Amino acid sequence: MCGFLRVHDPHWLDEAYSDAIAAADTGLVMRNISIACKVATVLYWAMKERGEGRYLDAAGGYGMLTRLMRDLGFNFYWKDKYCDNLLVPGFAYNDSLGACRSVTAIEVLEHVTDPVGFVKETLDEAGAQTIIFTTELYEGEPPRPEAWWYYAFPTGQHIGFYQRRTLVALGARLGLTLSSANGLHILSKSPVNDHLLKFLTNRWMSRLGPWWIRRRLGSKTMSDHELMLKRIV
């Protein structure tokens, strides 16, 4: 048993996704800010990114994480089959851009019916060998319905729930190794040491590190602004 807890027949998904982003997701903004800071420290110090790499935020919602990562100096692109690109027009990913070094998928795996298929398809489409993602994990027996907010029953959108061993098994199916710390999970052919990941994503590193990184890489905020103005005229 791998600890994967899922809904057998989520027949209500069309109704649940009449709005791609649930109105009850009041943590969306703060979550994206926090995740952007953690991902930045991991890419810069653990994966040695120095501004040359290309990255994809899969199932990127309105484009908030992509915008934040570009503001920090990373060459991020957006893709989402179900949501409008409101915040990074002009930076949607397509095959002509070439392969990506890594893919992010923030709060996505709990929404999919086939996580192995999703991870494989996402990595194949981006030409990447690393996926960085978040999803809340549970330990031991499945939590009682009234004891775990992450079920989010009223929204109907969360249909799959994981333990650490679930993610290990998922990665093994695809030849990937799991690294996990402080709510950030990485499946990769070149795994990050868990102790390093824990250090890079701790409270102080994820607060102070991104501002150093932004100075070193150079923010894309204004260059993107100028590019958008040129496209308007």
Residue ranges and their predicted role:
Residues E107, H111:
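A short His-aromatic
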Residues M1-S102, I106, V116-E125, T134, ...:
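Conserved N-terminal segment of class I S-adenosyl-L-methionine
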Residues G160:
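Residues that recognize and position ribonucleotide moieties
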Residues L137-E141:
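Short "lid" loop at the C-terminus of a central beta-strand within the Rossmann-like core
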